[in-house]
């Protein structure tokens, strides 16, 4: 496809308000991109403009600049693809490395996105252009990740070279700024006709913004996006495509989880899981990564098959297997050993679930105490005993079966903590060394216990 034919295709799609056709034309991959590369001709900006202007129609603003930069990006990306990713010092015919070519591809495509977002922010009605906005944002983010990855490999392999003033994730940070502008262009639409509003692209872009912020470890910036959404007059979330609902509710749930708002996190993550397509196993695994710790805190244990490391989902979730077993049986020793395992600890810290799992230890202690209580003989009135001596509890927890090395004073402190947090109903008669349990519901169901975050 010659540049002039490419330009005519863009003109036709614009006149027809065909966002899907434009998305296909401005995609980095696909048949159109491959066809355009075959007959690109003069790759200099001036030469490209001349080639584009040979079209039969008029390529107005911002489409001419977008076409030039898009074709430049395709050219740079094709040269980068011809170089091996493992050989960071390999150069093409013009003496440029893969890292440099990917940087050029990103910069050129960033100019495409910037020009379109400026145009899109004033477009009324603008809903027809949402497919193009989506593909531009997706491709920009993908190029940013590729360029930053190549730059990192080059900087690591060329340690002998003079130090350059480069920053990690430089392009991804620029991508985040562009995505923010795209989000503003969608949410700020004042078109009275909601059916044709740009607001229908809000949650699509928000999903990309959240994903980018999480990769940049700038999770706090997501709060600004949520505040803007709450203040905006948007259609109900349920009116958007289900895929966008799943993504949005997943990230809202994770944000609530990281902020230790476990009730809210459970609500959002549960809704996201229920709407997730049954074949989207990777997405289900991501959701369950945070939902399972919340469920453990509430005393709801996953089925063992869900944590089976031989299944696609289980491989990602198997790290929770020792904790669910310990919580089910009250095996505090096994819980502590799993938490102290360097591999498990590293995995939990990386996911951001370590603190939540650590908090489940109180629930495991409560299960242990209840198990001991249930093993005691009944009173003459055929009821469970409500007075347990600390000496008895200390002896029970020190047996070879349980193996907890607590002194009586430490055990008393643990019991007082469980009572304070609501895991046990009763009080400690310190002077007599007796735990006095409530005659009714001495061990409340875990789902009814408020999760302490201090």
Swiss-Prot record:
Q: Which InterPro entries match?
A: Csn12-like (IPR045114), PCI_dom (IPR000717), WH-like_DNA-bd_sf (IPR036388)
Q: Which GO terms describe its biological process?
A: poly(A)+ mRNA export from nucleus; post-transcriptional tethering of RNA polymerase II gene DNA at nuclear periphery; transcription elongation by RNA polymerase II
Q: Which GO terms describe its molecular function?
A: double-stranded DNA binding; RNA binding
Lineage summary? Eukaryota, Fungi, Dikarya, Basidiomycota, Ustilaginomycotina
GO CC terms of this entry: transcription export complex 2
Species this chain originates from: Mycosarcoma maydis (Corn smut fungus)
Name recorded for this polypeptide: Protein CSN12 homolog
Gene encoding the protein: CSN12
PANTHER family for this protein = PCI DOMAIN-CONTAINING PROTEIN 2, UNCHARACTERIZED PROTEASOME COMPONENT REGION PCI-CONTAINING
Q: Which residues form the PCI domain?
A: 246-442
Family under the similarity heading: Belongs to the CSN12 family.
């Amino acid at each position: 496809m010659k540049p002039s034919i490419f330009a005519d295709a863009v003109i036709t799609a614009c006149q027809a308000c065909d966002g899907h056709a434009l998305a296909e034309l401005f995609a980095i991959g696909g048949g159109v991109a491959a066809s355009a590369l075959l007959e690109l001709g003069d790759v200099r900006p001036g030469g490209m403009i001349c080639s584009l202007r040979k079209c039969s129609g008029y390529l107005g603003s911002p489409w001419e600049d977008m076409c030039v930069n898009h074709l430049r990006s395709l050219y740079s990306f094709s040269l980068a693809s011809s170089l091996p990713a493992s050989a960071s010092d390999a150069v093409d015919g013009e003496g440029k490395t893969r890292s440099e070519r990917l940087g050029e591809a990103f910069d050129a495509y960033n100019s495409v996105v910037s020009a379109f977002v400026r145009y899109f922010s004033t477009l009324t009605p603008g809903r027809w252009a949402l497919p193009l906005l989506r593909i531009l944002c997706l491709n920009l983010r993908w190029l940013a990740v590729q360029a930053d990855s190549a730059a990192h490999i080059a900087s690591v392999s060329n340690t002998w070279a003079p130090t350059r003033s480069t920053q990690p994730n430089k392009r991804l940070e620029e991508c985040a700024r562009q995505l923010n502008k795209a989000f503003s262009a969608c949410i700020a639409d004042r078109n009275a006709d909601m059916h044709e509003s740009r607001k229908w692209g809000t949650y699509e872009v928000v999903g990309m913004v959240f994903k980018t912020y999480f990769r940049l470890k700038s999770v706090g910036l997501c709060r600004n996006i949520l505040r803007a959404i709450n203040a905006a007059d948007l259609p109900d979330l349920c009116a958007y495509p289900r895929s966008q609902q799943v993504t949005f509710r997943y990230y809202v749930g994770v944000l609530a989880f990281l902020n230790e708002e476990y009730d809210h996190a459970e609500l959002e993550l549960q809704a996201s899981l229920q709407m997730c397509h049954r074949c989207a196993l990777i997405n289900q695994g991501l959701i369950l990564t945070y939902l399972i710790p919340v469920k453990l805190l509430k005393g709801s244990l996953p089925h063992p098959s869900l944590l089976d490391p031989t299944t696609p989902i289980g491989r990602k979730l198997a790290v929770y297997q020792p904790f669910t077993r310990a919580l089910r049986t009250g095996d505090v020793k096994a819980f502590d050993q799993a938490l102290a395992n360097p591999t498990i600890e590293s995995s939990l810290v990386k996911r951001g679930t370590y603190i939540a799992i650590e908090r489940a230890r109180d629930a495991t202690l409560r299960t242990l105490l209840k198990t001991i209580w249930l093993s005691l003989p009944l009173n003459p009135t055929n009821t469970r005993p409500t007075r347990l001596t600390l000496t008895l509890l200390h002896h029970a927890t020190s047996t070879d079966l349980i193996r907890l090395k607590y002194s009586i004073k430490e055990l008393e402190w643990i019991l007082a903590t469980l009572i304070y947090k609501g895991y046990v109903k009763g009080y400690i008669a310190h002077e007599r060394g007796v735990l006095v349990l409530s005659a009714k519901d001495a061990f409340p169901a875990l789902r009814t216990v408020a999760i302490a975050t201090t």
